Every structure is written in C-alpha cells, then in structure tokens.
Amino acid sequence: MSEIGTGFPFDPHYVEVLGERMHYVDVGPRDGTPVLFLHGNPTSSYLWRNIIPHVAPSHRCIAPDLIGMGKSDKPDLDYFFDDHVRYLDAFIEALGLEEVVLVIHDWGSALGFHWAKRNPERVKGIACMEFIRPIPTWDEWPEFARETFQAFRTADVGRELIIDQNAFIEGVLPKCVVRPLTEVEMDHYREPFLKPVDREPLWRFPNEIPIAGEPANIVALVEAYMNWLHQSPVPKLLFWGTPGVLIPPAEAARLAESLPNCKTVDIGPGLHYLQEDNPDLIGSEIARWLPGLA
C-alpha cells in the first residue's frame, strides 16, 4: 500500500445556505453526474482527501463540510439530525445538483440514505461504508467502545467528556483507525473544534445513534431508509473492513445477500474510518464502478 497522504490539495469553495456559509471541495469536469461525498462525526471533507483524486479525473467531486464542522460556519444550533438534514438539503439545491452519485460514511450515510429515499429519481448510485443502521441492543455495539458510548449518552458525563475533554477527537477517532494517525492528520481534525463551544455537533451525534430503540425518531427514520434500500434497485457499492465497527464482516455478508444490486469490497484491515486505512483501494474501486452506472 502506498503512503497515505496528509495534505489537503483543494481550493476552498463556499456557498450561503440558510444564512450560513458552508465550505466544500469542488474538483473535476463539470459534465456528467457529480459525485457527492458526505462525511460524518467528527470529520470533514479532509476524510476524502486521498479518495477524491481517484475519481476527479472523470467525475465532478463535491465534498461539503457539514454545518458546524470543518470549515463551515458554526451557528448556534442544537445540531439534531434534522438540523443537518435542513442544511444539506439546502446545500444540494444551492449547487443545483439534479442527479448525484453518493459516497457516504457514518452520519453522512444517514443523511445520504435519507436524502436518497426522498429523492430516488435523482440518485444514480450509492457507495457506502461503515454506515448508520439500527443497533437493536447494546450487546451488538462493539465491546471496545460500549462503555465509552454509554457514557457519551449519559447527560452530564457525556458533555464533560466530549465538550470539555474533546474525547471524540482525541479518543474515538484515533482508536477507530488501524494505523496510527500522524500529528499532522490529527491537527487537521482538531482544528475546527479547538474551542469547547464549537463541539456541540460532536456531542449530539453519538446521542442520536439508533441503539436499543433510542432515540425513537431516529430509529424510525433509519429503519425507513433501510427498508427503502432493501427494495431499491439503485446500484450500491459497500466497502467493509476487518474487524469493522458498525459493519463487521458478518453484517457485510448479510447485506451483500439482502441488498439488491449491491457489490461489496473487502478493504482488508479496517475499523470505522476506512478512508484512513485504505483510501487508494476505496478510490480506485469507486472509479472502476462509476462507468457502469446507467
């Protein structure tokens, strides 16, 4: 495997969305269907830095920073999932994206799947990895992270850990990559959240993960898009790693059998942030898959 690059060689782009500025990467040719890359918690478009160069020679690549994250503005919001839905919906409309191919991860997957379910005629394909799905019981949450995430979802304790101690950036992120992240990479991920006041999204997201039936509104929403995925013929490309976190190998095998029109790719060793362990394979497989989309 080639050395994993730490640089972010993309010019900044900004668009006003609901009165706030959202930052995004925008590279590649303007003709054809754009590829929309959606990150999750606690990352940004930086997560896609080594994947986009594989796709940009043939397709327009757009990678926003979710509101309150990366280089996007940080308005005073509760940062519920519905807040991110509003801003992402408006972002897609502001850029005039009629049809897209989605490349999605973590909470970006929930946002992407939810958008696709509501706009199926505008989705040409979905590439996904380590995505948000219903977790029926805490026993099915990875053991190494169980106590940590239970603490995150305990009112005052969770806020102290994530807001005051920055535990999602300093703890969860590096522990969910097989290789050691460099200080340069860690500093890129730290930069948007140097001030505790800016860490609200990092705290809200783990409290919205649909585990053991809570929170009920997110469980219902995620179950709805999972039902849609199991019925939709849209081409799907699922990346998985070993041991994985949200999508362990056994779950990937089940999904390969149950999802229509789904190709799977084993990236080898990987935890949650697969893009940091094998970006070249992910990027090259997306680039190989795209020409086959109708």
UniProtKB/Swiss-Prot annotation:
It comes from Rhodococcus sp. (strain TDTM0003). Gene3D superfamilies: alpha/beta hydrolase. GO terms for molecular function: haloalkane dehalogenase activity. The lineage of its organism: Bacteria, Bacillati, Actinomycetota, Actinomycetes, Mycobacteriales. Iodide binds at N41, W107. This is Haloalkane dehalogenase. SUPFAM superfamilies: alpha/beta-Hydrolases (SSF53474). The active site is at D106, E130, H272. One of its GO terms (cellular component) is membrane. The keyword Glycoprotein does not apply. Its EC number is 3.8.1.5. Transmembrane segments: none annotated.
